[in-house]
Amino acid sequence: MTFSEILDRVGSMGRFQFLHVAILGLPILNMANHNLLQIFTAATPVHHCRPPPNASTGPWVLPMGPNGKPERCLRFVHPPNASLPNETQRATEPCLDGWVYNSTKDSIVTEWDLVCNSNKLKEMAQSIFMAGILIGGLVLGDLSDRFGRRPILTCSYLLLAASGSGAAFSPTFPIYMVFRFLCGFGISGITLSTVILNVEWVPTRMRAIMSTALGYCYTFGQFILPGLAYAIPQWRWLQLTVSIPFFIFFLSSWWTPESIRWLVLSGKSSKALKILRRVAAFNGKKEEGERLSLEELKLNLQKEIALAKAKYTASDLFRIPMLRRMTFCLSLAWFATGFAYYSLAMGVEEFGVNLYILQIIFGGVDVPAKFITILSLSYLGRHTTQAAALLLAGGAILALTFVPLDLQTVRTVLAVFGKGCLPSSFSCLFLYTSELYPTVIRQTGMGVSNLWTRVGSMLSPLVKITGEVQPFIPNIIYGITALLGGSAAFFLPETLNQPLPETIEDLENWSLRAKKPKQEPEVEKASQRIPLQPHGPGLGSS
């Protein structure tokens, strides 16, 4: 008897599964608000130097830029030198008395004057948040293996709720960055546990649908944020509004059951059996649940227990040439996807279009993009889909370099197209990486690969600072990186309709078969298929 058959006995798609997926999905819906929050809480309005006390606000105080508007970071020295009759010859100085902001909405930029020489701090805040996700993945992944999925999920909900609320009351910018780091740390724990707990409790035939539903929760969450930001103009209240729900999720998570596989592998089979019987009773199959025994449960997971005893580390990813090449190519693709995604997702205000409408469009393009990706993965294959997604995204980003700023419509269309390609890349990478790595080292391979997408996400905001040297430099860097990531996919083997490798030896045999003349394809067993799982930047770990 397999675990899927045990799941069928207790109810594989009963009331429990639907409630379970809903409880896991609602936090993902709200998690998108935190990932993209700085689009609105760190918006930079039009601004100019505050005039000196007792000075008139006119051209004698504020020098005009090439566009006929006041310079944002300079003002004339006051009082003026009477010996210089031409105002263009007057000396200028930085904004010594602060700035005047042309906006009714406040943000961390207007509160702490993160403009001109301090504008780098705005990008630093987003990178600090991404660093929290990166460090959280490294720390909480190990803790999840030691203490279980549910405790990490529960603590992560509480951490995100508390640190998000703390950020709303931050008295200074450094304290705000500390809380944002902790927010990212909590998000990483939520992602890690949610993906595992979602997949385990649904049957194989329904995993694609349920994983699709979970993936779309993040997509639809992107529609909520613009509405909240429009209705709540104060950044502190907006920060608090998106954080409070996680206190509720913290309470509801106590209903979420622990991973059965983790319990059995940790020597807690009796507790696993109690949970299975509780699920059976909830699904109206109490008698079937009572018939289950510890012997059946252990026998079912015997293979997984044996695999768990085989210890593999990240160094094993570089032990054989094929595995080493795969790791390099996948890491580059993951890095490029996270790097390019956040260049567009967090650069909404750069296109000169209504911030709220464009964010809704950016979220909406994910819906058809993920659907097209599923079709492409099924019919064109993995490495073709992966290469196309990143190459098209890179091409769109590079094209932005050559489109004048006044052609806002063209620039917006290119940005939306590129944004749609990048979630497709995430979706493909999640499936592709799972299929390429052998079972005995799959979790390690996924962890290393996902580490690189977090590094890319963390570095992405910092690259925008190079725009101060030349405005086109950031898009050149983003675009070329995406093209390199797409090209790396051509060096990866195709996995469509191929059996999953269980051990490193299986992978070596797969490599030897690939060098032989092409024969009839091996029929893939249904039990070996990994479902297509739409993936997003907030669902980056498993």
Swiss-Prot record:
Its main location: membrane. It is found in: Basolateral cell membrane. It comes from the Eukaryota. One of its GO terms (cellular component) is apical plasma membrane. Residues 515-542 are annotated as: Disordered. Residues 1-20, 145-154, 198-212, 258-327, 376-386, 493-542 are cytoplasmic. The keyword Lyase does not apply. It is a multi-pass membrane protein. Residues 517-527 have a biased composition (Basic and acidic residues). The chain crosses the membrane at residues 21-41, 124-144, 155-175, 177-197, 213-233, 237-257, 328-348, 355-375, 387-407, 472-492. It catalyses: estrone 3-sulfate(out) + glutarate(in) = estrone 3-sulfate(in) + glutarate(out); estrone 3-sulfate(in) + 2-oxoglutarate(out) = estrone 3-sulfate(out) + 2-oxoglutarate(in); glutarate(in) + 2-oxoglutarate(out) = glutarate(out) + 2-oxoglutarate(in); urate(in) + 2-oxoglutarate(out) = urate(out) + 2-oxoglutarate(in). Keywords: Cell membrane, Detoxification, Glycoprotein, Ion transport, Lipid transport, Membrane, Phosphoprotein, Transmembrane, Transmembrane helix, Transport. The modification Phosphoserine is found at residue 4. GO terms for biological process: monoatomic ion transport; prostaglandin transport; response to toxic substance. Glycans are attached at residue 86. Functions as an organic anion/dicarboxylate exchanger that couples organic anion uptake indirectly to the sodium gradient. Transports organic anions such as estrone 3-sulfate (E1S) and urate in exchange for dicarboxylates such as glutarate or ketoglutarate (2-oxoglutarate). Plays an important role in the excretion of endogenous and exogenous organic anions, especially from the kidney and the brain. E1S transport is pH- and chloride-dependent and may also involve E1S/cGMP exchange. Belongs to the major facilitator (TC 2.A.1) superfamily. Organic cation transporter (TC 2.A.1.19) family. This is Organic anion transporter 3.
